[in-house]
């Protein structure tokens, strides 16, 4: 079953980030093929409450249309105009503080395991949280290869690398060494 982006909105409370709005987004497409044994999966994006309403308002008003329109003596697409305005406004400043929050919930065989991540801008290294959580994960993967822990050839999605316990544990330890912490709870 495929659900449209921005659908199935729900509010979620996070200890450090507060109340956030979760909604369906399009991503992790490789999971459909690599984790076919899992009957139900969802991926949701988290934003501050009200984000979806603003995006829907822009969409319904035509700001994401790609067909060019005439404005005075200029022809341009609403999407190009919107992108030009919003991308510069949304671009993170060099030392602007931000955070990353993630929750992974795995349910099956009568138990639930939850992984929670909260990370924020590191003023000591002047490294954004997004760089810390994604970049360090990529460099951990490079280290897996250089240390001979992952020797497969070709392109591999992250879930196939993480499917190996020694690789999964290595990545989590690598992140921990850089003060990126996951909390695991079981229930």
Which residues fall in each region the model found?
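C-terminal catalytic/substrate-binding lobe primarily of soluble NAD(P)-dependent oxidoreductases
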Residues: 1-187
């Amino acid at each position: 079953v495929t659900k449209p982006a921005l659908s199935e909105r729900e509010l979620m409370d996070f200890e450090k980030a507060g109340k956030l709005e979760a909604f369906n987004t399009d991503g992790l497409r490789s999971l459909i093929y690599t984790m076919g044994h899992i009957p139900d999966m969802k991926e949701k994006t988290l934003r501050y409450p009200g984000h979806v309403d603003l995006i829907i308002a822009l969409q319904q008003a035509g700001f994401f249309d790609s067909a060019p329109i005439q404005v005075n003596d200029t022809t341009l697409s609403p999407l190009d105009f919107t992108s030009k305005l919003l991308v510069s406004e949304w671009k993170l400043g060099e030392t602007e503080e931000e955070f990353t929050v993630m929750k992974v919930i795995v349910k099956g065989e009568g138990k639930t395991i939850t992984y929670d991540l909260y990370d924020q801008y590191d003023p000591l290294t002047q490294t954004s949280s997004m760089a810390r959580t994604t970049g360090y994960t990529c460099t951990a993967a490079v280290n897996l290869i250089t240390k001979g822990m992952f020797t497969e050839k070709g392109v591999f999605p992250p879930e196939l690398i993480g499917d190996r316990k020694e690789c999964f544990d290595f990545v989590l330890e690598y992140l921990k060494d850089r003060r990126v912490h996951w909390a695991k709870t079981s229930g």
